[in-house]
């Protein structure tokens, strides 16, 4: 059965909640599948499949920015993302029995990010989030959990004509635990990324559409861990991501959002591949 043991930060992913799927037939082989919700929480909006487990996370990225907080030029982003996770485990046991388990989760991940200019090109962004969630679909273990993310990001920008080049890095500590007894987890992520944006050469009204392409390297000194039914635990130390986003080189607002972007990314390496929707270069 699926038992709550972890947490989620978005969905999958990457999020992550610590719910887990627990299959109980007696054997020396692994029959406990822990849903890595804390990875889902960081992932935000995407999904992956691994050893019979399919995970999908959908995040409504609500936030509000207050300008000139604590100091002129500083900004405070109030974060209130709402995350929905959909998980499906379909595996076959050693005796040929087919096992199918579905579970859902909902989490609220409030937090704050302080944007501190450091010179003309760089913005330093310490942040913290702490949220709670609830799982549905399996009547086992604690259905409630908490998840946390904390760390700092920094991004620097240069302009070469109409081209914008961004270099970003981040350090993130993330974890989750059930409210009550059960499985908990955490990991540390070091990230380094590069994005190049360039206008597409035409206008739509006042908008000047542009295309951004990016790459990000992930290093986990405390590895990502994914349990697998009847298989050894998968531990990931290195991953890469490539992706793109579309937006406008001119300033605009849409549905209350300032200069929104949307795109897609592909995360690979360490035995896990992930597809995600992004809302711009996320470092």
Describe these PLM feature segments.
Residues 65-77, 116-124, 157-165, 200-211, ...:
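Short loop/turn motifs that connect adjacent beta-strands in outer-membrane beta-barrel proteins
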Residues 143-223:
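Detector for outer-membrane/organellar transmembrane beta-barrel domains
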Residues 60-68, 108-116, 150-158, 169-171, ...:
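Residues on the lipid-exposed face of transmembrane beta-strands in outer-membrane beta-barrel proteins
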Residues 21-96:
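Short glycine/proline- and aromatic-enriched beta-strand/turn motifs that initiate or cap beta-hairpins
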Residues 47-50, 94-100, 136-142, 177-185, ...:
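Extracellular loop and loop/strand-boundary signature of outer-membrane beta-barrel proteins
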Residues 54-60, 74-76, 102-108, 142-150, ...:
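Residues that define the transmembrane beta-barrel architecture of outer-membrane proteins
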Residues 45-49, 66, 82-90, 116, ...:
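Transmembrane beta-strands of outer-membrane beta-barrel pores
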Residues 86-100, 201-283:
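Outer membrane beta-barrel transmembrane domains
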């Amino acid at each position: 059965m699926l038992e709550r043991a972890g947490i989620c930060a978005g969905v999958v992913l990457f999020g992550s909640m610590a719910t887990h799927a627990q299959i109980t037939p007696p054997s020396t082989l692994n029959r406990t599948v822990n849903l890595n919700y804390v990875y889902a929480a960081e992932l935000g909006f995407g999904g992956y499949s691994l050893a019979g487990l399919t995970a999908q996370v959908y995040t409504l990225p609500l936030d509000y920015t207050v300008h000139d907080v604590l100091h002129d030029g500083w900004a405070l982003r109030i974060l209130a993302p709402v995350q929905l996770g959909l998980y499906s485990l379909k595996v076959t046991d050693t005796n040929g029995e087919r096992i199918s388990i579905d579970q859902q989760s909902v989490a609220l991940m409030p937090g704050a990010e302080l944007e501190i200019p450091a010179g003309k090109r760089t913005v330093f962004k310490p942040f913290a989030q702490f949220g709670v969630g609830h799982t549905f679909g399996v009547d086992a273990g604690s259905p409630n959990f908490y998840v946390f993310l904390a760390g700092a990001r920094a991004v620097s920008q240069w302009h070469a004509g109409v081209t914008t080049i961004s270099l970003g890095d981040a350090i993130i500590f993330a974890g989750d635990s059930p409210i009550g007894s059960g499985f908990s987890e955490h990991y540390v992520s070091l990230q380094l990324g590069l994005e190049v944006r360039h206008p597409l050469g035409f206008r739509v009204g006042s908008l000047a559409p542009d295309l951004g392409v990016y790459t990000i390297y992930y290093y986990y000194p405390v590895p990502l861990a994914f349990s697998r039914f009847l298989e050894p635990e998968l531990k990931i130390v290195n991953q890469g991501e490539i992706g793109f986003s579309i937006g406008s080189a001119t300033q605009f607002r849409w549905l209350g959002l300032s200069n929104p972007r949307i795109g897609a990314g592909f995360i690979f390496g360490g035995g896990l591949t992930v597809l995600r929707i992004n809302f711009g270069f996320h470092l």
